[in-house]
Amino acid sequence: MLQVAIAQKKFPCYYLENFRCMDGQMISSYLDIAQLNIDPQLIAKELKQLEQYIAASALPSVRWEYQIPELGEGGACSLFGYLQDEPFKLTDHVSATSQNEQKLANLQNIVNYIEQQTQVDWYGIYQAVDTAEGPQLLKLAYQGAPSRPLFPLTEAFAAGSNNVQVALSKRGRVINNVENYLAQGGEYYTCDPKVKAETCLPLFNEQHECVGIIDAEAFSNDFFDSRTLAVLVACCIKIPHFLV
């Protein structure tokens, strides 16, 4: 995947008051790379709350299989409301080891946290993986309606996919009015026609390479305010620790 040189902007320790300087550096780096304008102090507060939740909560069960929609001609679009007979098996792409099971359980725990904190209508975590068909985004954990499990990481698919565009560009996208965004010619992959707003954010490893994305969808316009975005970014900083 394309690598980009990043000029990092460091926030001094006192800028985040009672929060750790390391967290402040991670937050500032993330915002710089993803090109997002969100209050770093608010993200630091949400990150601290997330870490407290992870430490105190019991891990949920892992969903190794899930239903997926039928795909339209050429496999480009989901046929909303029509499900395939056979469930998608995550084990076709992820080994069912105890270590991977614990990581996936932690990811599902974060998904549950997002739902509790934001009441978002759909949320998913995707990891960039190599498949027989080439590099793709693989859905590891989610909540909401059935959706496609894999997105090809190609420039051609990015022309109609917000998820792939974010993964390839490493830039976050916040769309608080999908209808207006489409009318202006924006790239968008429509799965659920009820979706009115969407935020898609990249996930980075320690080398600042994009290793996946998160996707959040809401059934109302202007859903993603500063606090909701801070929760999402806090989780994006934590999620890479649990990728498989």
What residues fall within each predicted segment?
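Juxtadomain coupling helices with adjacent low-complexity linkers
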Residues: 23, 27-28, 32-44, 51, ...
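Short loop/turn motifs at secondary-structure junctions and domain boundaries
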Residues: 117, 190-195
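Feature detects long, helix-prone N-terminal segments enriched in hydrophobes
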Residues: 165-169, 194, 206, 240-243
